[in-house]
């Protein structure tokens, strides 16, 4: 909750990836706030006020996930809206002739994004969402200490450079929020 607020102000890509993880945590507890309260939140060193805030925040997200049909997969509207915002900014950067570094990073990452999208479950996601999914997937692999192949590493490197290109425009992205 506190991390999400901070990331939302500082780095929208990191915010989206964090929220993907939070959604997965909530799913792992079957969107049951009682289980989250008893098993997950005690892991943190919250004082009573912070614990109550965290409980309300997770409860709100769990309810949103249920109401919006994201109990098993997908993302809540607040996360999707942030992705749309990033996608809009992405299109603006691609159209800006002064953003040659961003454009170069994009065209280097594009073949990997297209390949990843082709390997998807048949649902054609926008390029930016595919890139975010790839970054989240590699994060999960690393958290689980699973090996990452050379091809995957090359793809993630190119996609990460695209994110770095976006971070260089952080001031303008933050102004959009």
Model-derived features: positions:
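Short runs of predominantly hydrophobic/aromatic residues within well-ordered alpha helices
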Residues: 12-19, 33, 54, 58, ...
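A structural motif
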Residues: 3, 45, 53, 62-66, ...
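Amphipathic alpha-helical interaction surfaces
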Residues: 25-28, 46, 60-71, 85-96, ...
């Amino acid at each position: 909750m506190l991390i999400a607020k901070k990331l939302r102000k500082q780095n929208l890509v990191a915010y989206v990836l964090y929220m993907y993880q939070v959604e997965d945590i909530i799913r792992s507890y079957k969107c049951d706030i009682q289980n989250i309260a008893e098993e997950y939140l005690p892991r943190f060193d919250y004082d009573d006020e912070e614990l109550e805030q965290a409980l309300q925040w997770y409860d709100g997200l769990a309810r949103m996930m249920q109401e919006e049909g994201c109990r098993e997969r997908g993302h809540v509207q607040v996360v999707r809206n942030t992705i749309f915002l990033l996608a809009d900014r992405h299109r603006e950067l691609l159209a800006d002739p002064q953003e040659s570094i961003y454009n170069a990073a994009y065209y280097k990452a594009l073949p990997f994004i297209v390949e990843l999208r082709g390997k998807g479950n048949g649902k054609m996601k926008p390029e930016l969402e595919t890139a975010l999914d790839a970054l989240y997937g590699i994060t999960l692999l690393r958290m689980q200490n699973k090996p990452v192949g050379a091809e995957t590493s090359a793809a993630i490197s190119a996609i990460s450079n695209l994110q770095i290109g976006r971070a260089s425009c952080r001031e303008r992205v933050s102004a959009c929020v």
